[in-house]
Amino acid sequence: RDDLVRIIQQLGKKANLVGASLGGMISLSLAGHEEESKYCSGLIMVDIGMRPNDEGSDRIVEFMRSGAKGFASVEEAADAVSGYLPHRERPKDISGLKKNLRLKEDGRYYWHWDPLFLTDRTGMGEVREERFRQLENSAKRISVPTLLVQGALSDILTNKEKEEFLNAVPHSKFAEIQQATHMVVGDKNDIFAEAIVDFLSEHIE
């Protein structure tokens, strides 16, 4: 959140925050902060509520861990993605996947995220629960125009998490993106973009 505040301060004006997954939770923590909410003029939560669904979250972590030892080729990485997202047609040209991979000295391709993100989470339960409680409190303080976007096939923002968020932020608008999973932008980018533009056009400052 501190990094986000610094970026907005450099812009010199309030920001409409659009956050997916972890980015959504960071945006929520700012928009509902007692002091720093002054930097936010609007909030769009993309397939995330005050907490992720536990089963869906575990599935993502398992996918990330499955690539911890890297891939022999871009094709092998593409196979892993196809296994995780079986509903999405595998593109004929997979060269775009290279931007998400790093070729290291051992000749293998690795996802570019920080491996520390995947360290053993044993004993972190209380810490995570406290963070989620803070997000619940933040949600109750939200006063700016808000939109919650849900991928209809999502296992991260299920109907349970959706209803919890809408109850905490009763003025929030809601948009469901059909045939989209948690990866809303990658699944149905055109429909997602239309929902975002419509909301911002109505509420932008």
Describe each PLM feature range.
Residues 1-10:
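Alpha/beta-hydrolase active-site loop
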Residues 7, 195-203:
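C-terminal alpha-helix
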Residues 40, 49-74:
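A catalytic-pocket lid/entrance helix-loop region that shapes and gates access to the active site
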Residues 72-125, 129:
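Conserved alpha/beta-hydrolase catalytic His-Asp/Glu region
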Residues 105-168, 173-176:
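Conserved serine/cysteine hydrolase catalytic core
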